[in-house]
């Protein structure tokens, strides 16, 4: 989750799936971010860096784990990209990598989290991206990913 600094700004919760999260060191993590309908995480971390990751156990042993830190966006044009992209499978719809330096870790019981069984990843994003093609994806980013819903620029907007 991320949030802008203004008290009336919108808090962003962005659930993730796929094999997109990596632990880079004892206090650094990253996730590969795909093109989607907004770009709140990039805009918020560009403004203030604050980011929280939450993981929930949905099997027999309940637990919630939160990672608190300062994050930033890395684009394919950035010097960091080559090394950071190495552990990820990069897709045509990969938009950026969000990197966070973790300053605090917290766990809680998770007793209120229901049990669920994983049945598989969704293919719809990749089908959508393929139907758009490279040019269509670029146009989609231009229309939907330059600014947050509160009007904050994402890193993509800051380099255009």
Each language-model region and where it sits:
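Binding-site signature for planar aromatic cofactors or substrates
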Residues: 1-160
């Amino acid at each position: 989750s991320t949030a802008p600094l203004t008290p009336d700004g919108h808090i962003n919760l962005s659930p993730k799936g796929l094999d997109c999260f990596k632990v880079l060191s004892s206090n650094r993590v990253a996730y590969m971010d795909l093109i989607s309908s907004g770009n709140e995480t990039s805009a918020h971390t560009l403004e203030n860096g604050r980011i929280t990751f939450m993981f929930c156990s949905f099997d027999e042993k309940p637990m919630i784990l939160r990672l608190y830190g300062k994050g930033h966006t890395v684009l394919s044009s950035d010097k960091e990209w080559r090394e950071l992209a190495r552990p990820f499978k990069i897709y045509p719809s990969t938009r950026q990598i969000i990197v966070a330096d973790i300053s605090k870790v917290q766990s809680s019981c998770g007793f209120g989290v229901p049990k669920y069984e994983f049945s598989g990843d969704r293919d719809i994003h990749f089908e959508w991206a393929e139907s758009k093609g490279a040019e269509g994806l670029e146009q989609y980013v231009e229309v939907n990913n330059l600014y947050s819903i509160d009007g904050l620029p994402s890193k993509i907007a800051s380099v255009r």
